[in-house]
Amino acid sequence: MKQYDVIVIGGGPSGLMAAIAAGEQGAGVLLIDKGNKLGRKLAISGGGRCNVTNRLPVEEIIKHIPGNGRFLYSAFSEFNNEDIIKFFENLGIQLKEEDHGRMFPVTDKAQSVVDALLNRLKQLRVTIRTNEKIKSVLYEDGQAAGIVTNNGEMIHSQAVIIAVGGKSVPHTGSTGDGYEWAEAAGHTITELFPTEVPVTSGEPFIKQKTLQGLSLRDVAVSVLNKKGKPIITHKMDMLFTHFGLSGPAILRCSQFVVKELKKQPQVPIRIDLYPDINEETLFQKMYKELKEAPKKTIKNVLKPWMQERYLLFLLEKNGISPNVSFSELPKDPFRQFVRDCKQFTVLANGTLSLDKAFVTGGGVSVKEIDPKKMASKKMEGLYFCGEILDIHGYTGGYNITSALVTGRLAGLNAGQYARS
């Protein structure tokens, strides 16, 4: 029967980080994963370039982790985003900063990040087993004691770190295996839901694919409550699809759509094409341009204002022919057209499923986890890190920051615990 100090289950970002941290404490570590290679989620992150962290101040990073980000304050006081940058630079990975604080390897290759982590594991003599499914985690006398593999092999250890991810992006291996093991240790799993996920709509223009493939730049997208008040607004790009809406602004708003759908059957999403101009000013500016070119068609005058497909769509919606000139322009429908430029509303009736989401909302309740150690409050020697925890952030280096920070602390503390 094999015996290790620490067993890490899951070879994603947080599991790799945990195995390295435990190994650096001098612990004998086994890293076990059911897939055929480690770091699969890392390798596809950031469009294959790997957005390893974000350089914004800690306060801002917490704001970009709307799902229990505040739980990470203690963790960040031990190991934060600047420490992540130093960690990678010490492994020989030079990073560069891009828009919104996003940090990428200078090589633009996610694989270089994965390789650097694997080399570090090798240096620390961490035992790696891939293609190995786990049946259960062993608990004896209120203590984590090892694992049982699918073929019945028992492997003992002083500490176990569960780093198996959530239920999103399942082709990388995160299929929700860990929730059962957490429950067996007495943990509560909060309700799971998709976040960072495209939104669906049954609007006729969506079904008819009128705007399919059309992308709007730097628009303000708001999710409205029952009273028509915005719950959240994100100013970014968005995209119309054959099933609804997608793109960065929509992905960020999606978790609020999921929550609001519990209160109303359809959730209004408002699109403001010109967030920096108020409606009256916009009306006056457009009206003035039309007035100054009285013979030109409305389509030709307003073409520079927005993409032609969107312009024609909003004109038709308000019963205005694209070929009318200023003298024939009906004023009331034109006012309504301007209002639609500022507050066109699409009714969302759902989102794509959890396996199509980028991030899982919900997970092991953070109330039952020591925030400085990532240790279970229910079971001695048990640790959690990464997306299995009830923590979720926006895309842009925030989830990976949470995964790497919680992984570092879980590994560090599990290593020290096992050695003591």
UniProtKB/Swiss-Prot annotation:
According to the lineage, what is the superkingdom? Bacteria
Q: Which InterPro entries match?
A: BaiN-like, BaiN-like_dom, BaiN-like_dom_sf, FAD/NAD-bd_sf
**UniProt binding sites for FAD:** S14, D33, I134, E387, N399, I400
What keywords is this UniProt entry annotated with? Answer: FAD, Flavoprotein
Record-annotated membrane-spanning stretches: none
Q: Which cofactor does it need?
A: FAD
Q: What protein family does this chain belong to?
A: Belongs to the BaiN/RdsA family.
- Name of the protein in question: Uncharacterized protein YtfP
Which lineage do the record's taxonomy fields give for this organism?
Bacteria, Bacillati, Bacillota, Bacilli, Bacillales
